[in-house]
Swiss-Prot record:
One of the GO biological process terms: electron transport chain
Record-level Gene Ontology MF annotations: 2 iron, 2 sulfur cluster binding; electron transfer activity; metal ion binding
Co-factor(s): [2Fe-2S] cluster
SUPFAM superfamilies associated with the record: 2Fe-2S ferredoxin-like
Function: Ferredoxins are iron-sulfur proteins that transfer electrons in a wide variety of metabolic reactions.
This protein's name: Ferredoxin-1, chloroplastic
Domain 2Fe-2S ferredoxin-type: 46-136
Record note on cofactor: Binds 1 [2Fe-2S] cluster.
InterPro entries given in the database record: 2Fe-2S_ferredoxin-like_sf, 2Fe-2S_ferredoxin-type, 2Fe2S_fd_BS, Beta-grasp_dom_sf, Fd_pln
Gene field: ADI1
NCBIfam families according to UniProt: fdx_plant
Gene Ontology cellular component annotations, sorted alphabetically: chloroplast stroma
The UniProt record lists the keyword Transmembrane: no
Length: 139
């Protein structure tokens, strides 16, 4: 056999091919270990601006981390109680951007459509601006 076997005809296994998708704010490639070996997974990180009674604060939130959890990690004091998406203590109002709060069970469809959010069960899906400390306005 000649040494010409390696050429442009070599195909990568499906696990090594890169799929194209719309570019989020930031993308990180993180190793994820499992029993079958190491794999790579894409993780988007978004700019989240929180408008609190004490002023505005901005943070970077990965798309698989709840906004409340990341705020606490960065020392930002936000209200919460159940941390299960079943009360209104952490309620806020989305001013702009997209979030995924499909895990919560307190807000009804009309409230979600009106922009209400429970930060304890909200993932960013784009850059987002949220007014916090809004429980009294919701009830």
């Amino acid at each position: 056999m000649a040494a010409t076997a390696l050429s442009s005809q070599v195909r990568l296994p499906m696990s090594l091919r890169v799929a194209t998708a719309p570019a989020p704010a930031r993308v990180s490639v993180l190793p994820a270990s499992n029993k079958l070996g190491d794999r790579l997974r894409m993780q988007a990180t978004y700019n989240v601006k929180l408008i609190t009674p004490d002023g505005e604060v901005e943070l970077q939130v990965p798309d698989d981390v709840y906004i409340l959890d990341q705020a606490e990690e960065e020392g930002i004091d936000l209200p919460y109680s159940c941390r299960a998406g079943s009360c209104s203590s952490c309620a806020g109002k989305v001013v702009s951007g997209e979030i995924d709060q499909s895990d919560q069970s307190f807000l009804d469809d009309d409230q979600v459509a009106a922009g209400w959010v429970l930060t304890c069960h909200a993932y960013p899906k784009s850059d987002v601006v949220i007014e916090t400390h809004k429980e009294d306005d919701l009830i």
